[in-house]
Regions:
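Substrate-binding pocket helix/loop in short-chain dehydrogenase/reductase
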Residues: 3-5
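Active-site helix of classical SDR
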Residues: 19, 55
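Alpha-helical segment proximal to the catalytic Tyr-Lys
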Residues: 24, 68-72
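Residue(s) in the substrate-gating loop at a strand-loop-helix junction
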Residues: 39
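SDR active-site lid
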Residues: 72-137
Length: 160
């Protein structure tokens, strides 16, 4: 459970804590924008990433609730769902025993360039989007299909 707690601390509780730290200021000024980083994995459970997927789903739901609570005060809440982006995320991902994975996933290596991800995110935020899925066709199709049939997309994402 130690590994699961570490993942939840980084991917969920850290974003909640940061938001709670700035929220009083935003409420006082009656304006602002809070942007959360979730993941396509938070919309589609992925094999060997159960806790990561759960943490990213949790921040998505927390953001949805926050949006309902603060919208009338002029605060906008957005959630970004990156697909595969070329970063060290899989290299540093924690394995079941709490150690760094130590190698880069092929999907990450072939993912969207980090600069392109940033540009697409900023563009979507400037258009006042609240639910922002950024990735290739594969990720966007997966998100769409997961809404129609979560169990089928879950089985399709399994690796032997």
């Amino acid at each position: 459970m130690e590994t699961e707690r570490k993942i939840m601390e980084v991917d969920y509780f850290a974003q909640v804590a940061m938001t709670k730290a700035v929220l009083p200021t935003l409420l006082k000024q009656k304006s602002g924008r809070v942007v959360f980083i979730s993941s396509v994995a938070g919309l589609i459970g992925t094999q060997y990433r159960a806790t990561y997927s759960a943490a990213k789903a949790a921040i998505h739901m927390w953001a949805n609730s926050l949006r309902a609570e603060v919208a009338a005060q002029g605060i906008h809440v957005a959630v970004v769902f990156p697909g595969f982006v070329k970063t060290n995320v899989s290299l540093n991902a924690l394995t079941g025993n709490g150690e760094a994975q130590g190698f880069q996933d092929e999907a990450i290596e072939q993912g969207l360039d980090a600069d392109e991800f940033a540009q697409q995110t900023v563009k979507a935020l400037l258009q006042n989007q609240e639910y922002i899925v950024i990735g290739g066709r594969k990720e966007k199709l997966g998100v769409m299909l997961s809404r129609l049939s979560p169990s089928k997309i879950g089985r399709a994402s399994c690796r032997e």
